[in-house]
Amino acid sequence: MASLITPQFERYVAEQTIARGTVQFDEFIFANIPGLNENNLTQHLTIPTSAQIVHRQAVSQSGVINENAVVYSVTIGTEVGDFDFNFIGLINRSKNLLAVAVQTDTVKKIRNKNAVQGNSITRNMLLEFSGAKALTGINVNANTWQIDFTVRLHGLDEKIRLTNRDLYGRAVFFDDSFLVKRKTGNQFTIQPGNAYVEGVRMDLGTEHHLTANSLPCSIYADVVHHCTVTGEYQTEIKYLTQSKADYVDTANRQHYVQILADIDSQGNVTDRRLLSPFWGMNPLTLDDTTENTKDKLGHTHKLPIASIKKRGITKLSSATNSDSETQAATSKAVKTAYDKAVEVKTTAESKVGLRGNESIQGTKSFESKIIGFRGIGVADSQTYANANHLLNMGANDGDGWIEYKKSNRVIGTIRIRANGELSYNNQKIYHAGAKPQFNTDIEGKPNTLAGYGIGNFKVEQGQGDANGYKTDGNYYLASGQNLPENGEWHIEVVSGGATNAVRQIARKANDNKIKTRFFNGSNWSEWKDAGGDGVPIGSVVSFPRAVTNPVGFLKANGTTFNQQTFPDLYRTLGDSNQLPDLTRSDVGMTAYFAVDNIPSGWIAFDSIRSTVTQQNYPELYQYLVDKYSSISNVPLAEDRFIRNTGNGLNIGQTQSDEIKKHVHRVRTHWADSSDSSIFYDKTKTVIDSRLRTATTTDDNLSDNGFMHPLLDTPMATGGDETRPKSLILKLCIKAKNTFDDVQFWVKAFGVVENVGALDAGTLAQNMQALSESVGQKIKENKQSTLLEINNAKADINQKFLQVQESLSQIKTVWQGNVSSGRINISEKCFGKTLILYLQSSESHRLDDNNNIEPVSFEVGAEIEGKSGGGVYLSATHDVTPHYSSGGSRLYGVGVKKFAVYVGRDGTTIEIEDLSNYFVKRIDIR
């Protein structure tokens, strides 16, 4: 059998712990997985397939063991079945997340059917992890429902057996039950019937046939009362031909062996059963003449004459002085003897027991209790009693005892105390009613996990390099290398025994910081804040506009960034340092709506003059004022058709309605007719003074012969306006930006901390935000000259780039607290600046900012590979002159000198002189 927790469980608990959420497991699954065994369970740490799952059931009960341990229980009733399973899993059903997988030998689950009792199964899973009670929200104590009735049921069975034992003794057989008879040759039969052996009832329904291969022998019944797989109890009987004592088999079941008969070498059977003297015998009428009669059951009877060796019929006698061994005493003889005994008793009581020290010979039976007020002493013989080899028994209101003495010296005493405790020589004897307590009764308890044989988990104080801690456990490091930062840390290591999947979780002592990293078998990853990778680099996230500088983000405004400062973002954007511009606004766009209710953020176009102010809609106000100089100059759309700008038309220009220039002509006469007669049909037109005509008398020869009706004449056609076919909708303008309440930011980096006073990532982000802010302020300042604007921007950008470049190149390669000796840094320093952070006291810390003196050395690139050794580097600080007492003569100079020796490998540094200072950290740039 094997059980494992899953990686999903560990992540789930960690996530809920960080989020202060709730850990929930609500269902058990039972599956039958082919080939599953305890050695390959690690290959099955996912929820089995639906074809393999044979049963699913909600958690029946859950309870608390202690603050860090909870137990989940499920009971499958007898109405469920039939199926086999070898896998049990505890899951979170909504998340489809497997927490614990258990491999077990194949178990059969049988339900009730056809009057055959099924089996019920209870399975419990205990989960232990930090804060389990608080995380799961379970408050019920497991003691209220984790009850095992096995002992109780077994006790009931044992009580019934002991009751039968009290009634029937060791064994009793009724009538011919289990009577052994010879059939022929070595073939024998055992007759059916009932019997009791040590209180266990034996039932033989039919005649049993037995072969005795070797004679002589004896026949024994071997009986055991035990439970079947369904919980049903049955009695099993087998027959032996060799003697065997009562025994307990490999299944821890008690067997009782009772002799039935002896068979001699000729096959003759001697009945050895213990027959009941009063149970099961059918009463028959017998007298002194009964002999060789056969009853209806086939029994034959021959009454023997009673003797001192054999039961039978006998004569009676009233004599009190007879020594006959063939006659029985009558009541009269007994009465006479009784009277004499009373007389003797009276005499004896006056003589025996008054002074004690009498010796009473022979076996005596006492019908009532024996009470000894000074205890009771028992010895095997008078000789042993005289030698004070005694077993003394006694009791009082506090306890009872059995004491063994040898030569009047106490060897040992067993006591039963009034509170139920047992002891031997005043040392407790533990039992089911008085179990030992771990804290008070067990001595010499180990105080380490190793003391309990647990070698794959450690709890200890550590030191040195954190990279070396790969064994599961909890460690405390006051200082060391490769910690997340300076200070004291608690390191939790989780690996499950794997060497290529090691997780370290670091919690800073007396702080809330939590960082984590992993080891893949070759390298350690960088330390990161726990839960800090929720938003991937490059993700676009919206924040309320009130959030002006979220840590880890750059505003998505189309600007560029320094790729050395944000290398991860640069790679994510496809090797580009251009941020997306998501500052676009939709204010000022127009749209038609087919409803009367205008959506939020829009206003009717013709309400601009009355509703748009700098306070209400500042962005739209600015756009319109920039275009039309004043809100009152914004044209009204009214009932106009909207045209596109171009072809001489400008935005905001309005036009009256108009029809392209054209004429309609009506013929009035034929100017080219030879008779020059006027052609005018009064039936087709009207005679009206408003009908203008052009005749041959005017100068415009091309329109001669036509007339032009006026608009107010009946000949005018059309409506009140010129228009195409139309659909009337509501023209509106966007007055408020859709994303007016939010700003878009790009995830640029996780929390990147440099030990010391600077946070490079946040500083770079703040510098970029400062640049944008200043640019905005300059833009708003209409009185600043273009030269001032450009100079200010250039100055800020230059400083920003200098800070970015400087910070991006600094890297910590060692941390510690030494003033002499050798230091090994984590990276070669050839061609770089070596920066040592010094303090005058060993107890000072860099994060105290107390008396920090940085010293830097330039390590030339030409040193790498140099033959003959490394290079000696020195620096001189604080040259102090010393004058004579009168101050007239300079007699010396005090110099603070710092010197180191860099080895040819570029990573070994020998401290030569630090002027009694201590180096706390080394950076390279």
Swiss-Prot record:
It comes from the Viruses. The keyword Amino-acid biosynthesis does not apply. This is Probable tail fiber protein. It is found in: Virion. To phage P22 protein H. One of its GO terms (biological process) is symbiont entry into host cell. The keyword Acyltransferase does not apply. It comes from Haemophilus phage HP1 (strain HP1c1) (Bacteriophage HP1). It holds the Pfam family Collar. Probable tail fiber that mediates the attachment to the host cell. Keywords: Host-virus interaction, Late protein, Viral attachment to host cell, Viral tail fiber protein, Viral tail protein, Virion, Virus entry into host cell. GO terms for cellular component: virus tail, fiber. Coiled coil: none annotated. SUPFAM superfamilies: Receptor-binding domain of short tail fibre protein gp12 (SSF88874).
